[in-house]
UniProtKB/Swiss-Prot annotation:
Modified residues (4-aspartylphosphate): D58
One Pfam family from the record: Response_reg
All copies of domain CheB-type methylesterase, residue ranges: 166-357
SMART domains: REC
Additional observations: R.palustris does not have a group 1 operon.
Domain of life the protein comes from: Bacteria
Stated name of the protein: Protein-glutamate methylesterase/protein-glutamine glutaminase of group 3 operon
Domain text: Contains a C-terminal catalytic domain, and an N-terminal region which modulates catalytic activity.
Molecular function terms, GO-annotated: phosphorelay response regulator activity; protein-glutamate methylesterase activity; protein-glutamine glutaminase activity
Amino acid sequence: MAKQKIRVLIVDDSASVRQVLGTILAEDPEIEVIGTASDPFVAAKRLQNELPDVILLDIEMPRMDGITFLRKIMAQHPIPVVICSSLTPEGSDLMFEALEAGAVDIVPKPRVDTRQALMESSGRLREAIKSAARARVRPRAARKVIEQKLTADAIIPPPVAGRSRPTTERIVCIGVSTGGTEALYDVLEVLPPNCPGILIVQHMPQGFTAAFAKRLNAGCQINVKEAEDGDPVLPGWAYIAPGARHMLLVRSGLRYQIAIKDGPPVSRHRPSADVLFRSAAQYAGANALGIIMTGMGDDGARGLLEMRKLGAYTCAQDEESCVVFGMPKEAIACGAVEKVVSLNQIPREIMAWQQAKQPASAD
C-alpha cells in the first residue's frame, strides 16, 4: 500500500514565491501541493472545500496578515501551520507572536543566491513540512508578563560576576526543537528563583535567540538570557544557546561555566543538544539532570545516553504532551531515558531532583 502524501496549501501574496515553494516541495515524493492562495481570503475559500495536512503561510500579506489568519485557523479548524517568511531579527516579535498563536514552526524563505544555499534552505523547508504533519496542534493562551520582574531590578544592572556570587552544584540541561518555544515557557515560567542553573539548546535561526530569551525572561520568575562565552552557571538562571553556535558546559576550578564554540553542525544541528549533553556528561556527571523535549529527529539521544552512563538523571517528555514526539522517542529507544514525564511534570521533576540529590564530589 502506497504511503499517503502530505497535502500542503501554500499561502503567499507573491506569485514567484508560491512557484518556488511549490517546486521545492514537489521534489519530495512524500509531499503534494494541493493548491496555492494569494491571500488569506482566497485560502479560506479553499479550506471550505478541502482541508490540507499542513498550511505553509507567509506573515506579511495584503487584506489580512498571516497572524490574524493563523488565529482564525486555530479557532475554527486547527491545522498544522508552518510560517515561511523573510526572517530578520528586527521582525522577531512577529515570529514569536506566530508561535504563540499556534504555528508549529517557522522557516526562512528559500535562499536562491547560491546553489548550496538553495539546497540547504530547501531541505529545511521540506523537513519542517514533514515535522508539522506529525504535530499535535494546540491553540495557545496569551502569555502574561511577570509583574515583579518590572521593578528596579529590571533597571539596575546585576553585579559583576565574582567569587561572592553563588555557584550551582547541580546543573539542568535541556534539548528541544519543534514545539519547544511554547513548551519552554510552560516549564520555565513556574520554576522558582532557587532552581538549579539551566542550559537550553533550542533549535532556532541565528539572530533570534536573544529576543527569545528576552521574551522568556519577561514571563518567568527566574532570569533568562542568551548564553555568552564565559558565563558562570548560577542558580535561578536559564541560558539559551545562541543560534548557529554550539554551547558547552565546562568547569573553571569549582565553578561551572558556559563555553560558546563555532564548528560544523552535529546531528544536523548547530547548536546541538548532543554537544551540550556530552559536555555535561564529561564535566558534571552525576550532578546533572538531562531533559529531552518535543522535537523532530534524533539530536540529543546519544548525548543523553552518555549522561546517563556517567551517572546523570535523565528524563524525556511524553508523547501525549509533545508537539512532535521525535527526539524523545529516539532517546527512549536507545536507552538514554530513566523516566518519561508529561510537560507539566517537568518543573516538579527538576525541583524534586534538586531537593533529593546530594551533589557528587567536584574532584
